[in-house]
Amino acid sequence: MTTQLDALRNMTVVVADTGDIDAIKKYQPQDATTNPSLILSASSLPQYAPLIDEAIAYAKAKSADKTQQLIDAEDKLAVNIGLEILKIVPGRISTEVDARLSYDTQATVEKARKLIALYNEAGISNDRILIKIASTWQGIRAAEILEKEGINCNLTLLFSKAQARACAEAGVYLISPFVGRILDWYKANSDKKEYAPAEDPGVISVTKIYNYYKQYGYNTVVMGASFRNVGEITELAGCDRLTIAPALLKELQENSTALVRKLAFKGEVKAKPQPLTESQFYWQHNSDPMAVEKLADGIRKFAIDQEKLEKMLLEKF
């Protein structure tokens, strides 16, 4: 009996959206993605206690300055969790830059280089790592610099076509357009509270981005993210990659209903348009109130969880 998860693997690279090692072992994804919220959640698991202790010891040995120690411990913990995950997945781990740097190109570049250096010191090559960066104009510019240095990036919190287009034009390795958070916004801001999967505004957004990339021959990988239900996932079967939380991986594994491929580009590849300028990017992105609100909200939420993680680490120093 073929499960929907097995069927999905035949048309899409399945990625686990979690820092939980036990869940990753169970569902055997190709890659895994983490973010500050997932790192915070994983840090409460007992098996991660030694990783926290090691990160703090590393930070204390590296600097006598308390502020710097905290920064170093955060970075080392994120990498330590990534290293554990890389023992299980055959592909890549996505590790996220501090969301509070989302509007600072140079600081984002420097943080990414530091995270990569920590992985390299542990014997992990660049081709097993993706640096996650919020899809702000400044974040996209940082990714453009990093890609030229051989550091592949995963541009996250992506809600608008302008963000997707700017990422492709910058030569970004991979984007994570969000599905569920778009649905959340439309439910909260319209009278319609229920959507069939094919009418889900998040599904429609990712489908349009996928088709746009294929239509113009962009190599940037499209990895749908942030799912609220299995219907959103099955409606995007055929997308380059999908990053899925363990609870939804479980549902897919327990369902044997036939899965039909929904995304597959057929047609001629067109000449690429001129890249967006900064002013064009902001005009187009800001024309979409959902994208503006959800990008800002996502950055805020990740920053809050980063601060909670810092508080937890400080208590252990």
UniProtKB/Swiss-Prot annotation:
Task: Give its E.C. classification number.
Answer: 2.2.1.2
Q: Which GO MF term does the entry hold, naming one?
A: transaldolase activity
**Tree of life domain:** Bacteria
According to its UniProt record, which reaction does this protein catalyse?
A: D-sedoheptulose 7-phosphate + D-glyceraldehyde 3-phosphate = D-erythrose 4-phosphate + beta-D-fructose 6-phosphate
A single GO BP: pentose-phosphate shunt
Q: Which Pfam families match?
A: TAL_FSA
Q: In which pathway does it act?
A: Carbohydrate degradation; pentose phosphate pathway; D-glyceraldehyde 3-phosphate and beta-D-fructose 6-phosphate from D-ribose 5-phosphate and D-xylulose 5-phosphate (non-oxidative stage): step 2/3
Question: Does the keyword field hold Transferase?
Answer: yes
Question: Where is it located?
Answer: Cytoplasm
**What are the positions of the active site?**
K132
List the InterPro entries. Aldolase_TIM (IPR013785), TAL/FSA (IPR001585), Transaldolase_1 (IPR004730), Transaldolase_AS (IPR018225)
Respond yes or no to whether keyword Methyltransferase is given for this record. no
Q: What function does this protein fulfil? A: Transaldolase is important for the balance of metabolites in the pentose-phosphate pathway.
Which family, according to UniProt? Belongs to the transaldolase family. Type 1 subfamily.
- Its name, as the record gives it, is Transaldolase
Organism (species): Histophilus somni (strain 2336)
Task: Give me the gene this protein comes from.
Answer: tal
